[in-house]
Amino acid sequence: MIDETLFDAEEKMEKAVSVARDDLASIRTGRANPGMFNRIHIDYYGASTPITQLSSINVPEARMVVIKPYEANQLRPIEDAIRNSDLGVNPTNDGNIIRVSIPQLTEERRRDLVKQAKSKGEDAKVSIRNIRRKAMEELARIKKDGDAGEDDVTRAEKDLDKSTHQYTSQVDDLVKHKEGELLEV
């Protein structure tokens, strides 16, 4: 029971770090990056589908992204979805492909994006701490019910604390890396 609780908690913490990694990747830096389009979806035959599954996305230059839809009729919906997203870019459609020029970030916009990155990192750390709290409650219940000895539960709690620290450190590293990317001119 203890091993299951620890395994389940670690799995959830890993997922929280993965979500944080995806969230941080969706924040645009001053450079072109295909990952910035991961969160943009369009309605494709009644299903909300990411544009990354409906087109090829290439970065021919540092500040230019070229999006080529697999189906020509998806050109307009993809262009509209990008324009309406929170990326702050203006796509141009030449009939076959969509070109997205990535404008230089202003100092104020960089600071806002750093705040946004820190906020997403803090959300992930709160999620990890909540997972830890629930696992600790489960370990206390196991101890109370007599399903495991006190030494085993104490050892499991220390392992859980170690895992919590490890995953929160990973989130801190991700945020620090993103902050460096954003502040780099």
From Swiss-Prot:
Entry keywords, A to Z: Cytoplasm, Protein biosynthesis
GO CC entries: cytoplasm
CDD domains for the chain: RRF (cd00520)
Any one Pfam family match given in the protein's UniProt record, by short name: RRF
Compositionally skewed regions (Basic and acidic residues) per UniProt: 142-164
UniProt region (Disordered), positions on chain: 142-173
Record-level Gene Ontology MF annotations: ribosomal large subunit binding
Primary location class: cytoplasm
Subcellular location: Cytoplasm
Domain of life: Bacteria
Gene3D superfamilies reported for this sequence: 3.30.1360.40, Ribosome-recycling factor
Any single biological process term in GO: translational termination
Signal sequence, renumbered to the chain: none
Family stated for the protein in its record: Belongs to the RRF family.
Function: Responsible for the release of ribosomes from messenger RNA at the termination of protein biosynthesis. May increase the efficiency of translation by recycling ribosomes from one round of translation to another.
Protein name: Ribosome-recycling factor
Source organism of the structure: Mycolicibacterium gilvum (strain PYR-GCK)
Gene that this sequence comes from: frr
